[in-house]
Amino acid sequence: MIIVNTKTGKSGKEGKVNVSINHYTSFQQVYNYPEMASVNDWADYWNEAATLIPGVSGFGENDPSQATPIGDISGIPEVDWQDLITRDGRIDNTDINISGNTGKTNYFISYNRFYQEGIIEGSGLERNSIRLNFDTKVNDKLRAGVRLALTDRRQEVNKVNFNQVYFNILPIRQIYDVNGNYTAVNPISGTTQRNPVSDINHRIRHRFVTNILANAYAEYNILPDLTLRTSVGTNLTFNKFNRYVPTVDPIRNLQGTGGKADVDHSRKTGVLNENTLTYSKEIGAHSFKILAGFTLQKDTFSDLGAGGQGSANDVVTFNNLALGAISTTNTIN
């Protein structure tokens, strides 16, 4: 069972305004990094694998005449990719609440700001929320109220392929080559691989979400035992996701494919109208209630995705998809 308590301001002394402010800050840290083989252990393993032959025993043995992929092991610089892509995280949370009542009117207003710097470099979240609850007694027969919640969220989506860092990127692979450019190639297999440091510094992955939840109601006592209640509410969600891989991305730079941009927009709307008529009666030690009503509801969803690649520079990033040599679109309604 989940019980949700809605604050309305009724509990305060009439005519008094109550204000409360709460804040906390916390920190996050990777407690235990997975233990990875040292560069020397890793190099020894690869050299042994490269010189392994069946041998007369059938169990395999190393042939010293075979060429080894890694020569001078002692001179290999080691790159700690785990350390490069992580950091100490931080969370800040602030709540401000204002409530009160004037006898016939109760109100509650709150503001919340949540800010997080993720433990992965370049990731984070900022959320701002405003909530309003308002109830008033217009006269002896009529009561009305409003519920409103606004939330705006900006997320710096993780730019790093974390699995690749653990399972594919070698500790002997350097961040930069001798010319100061980001490396893009596995030094053993020769295949292209993303560079996590380049991803963190240059890729763009922004998500914006705005949600509006609103409801208004009115109750009217037609007779002492007969009450009409009507309410209308809406739930609106707007989502935008911007992504951009720049021209300086080592793989795209190596392949000469230019920048790549993608933008997704989605909108979800819902409208709900509820109408009820309630008759309540007590006769002696007995009571009964009759409820009748109807509901109207409509939900819609639309999504538009567009992309472009082949842009010659990173000046406008995802803000002008027409600059791309290749364009794509996808629409859902």
For the regions a protein language model found, what residue spans apply to each?
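A beta-strand signature from Gram-negative outer-membrane beta-barrel systems
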Residues: 1-20, 91-93, 114-117
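Outer-membrane beta-barrel initiation region
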Residues: 84-88, 98-102
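N-terminal entry motif of extracellular EGF-like repeats
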Residues: 80-81
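Surface-exposed loop/interface segments of Gram-negative outer-membrane beta-barrel transport/assembly proteins
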Residues: 11-77, 118-213, 231-333
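Short, charged beta->alpha transition segments
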Residues: 94-97, 187
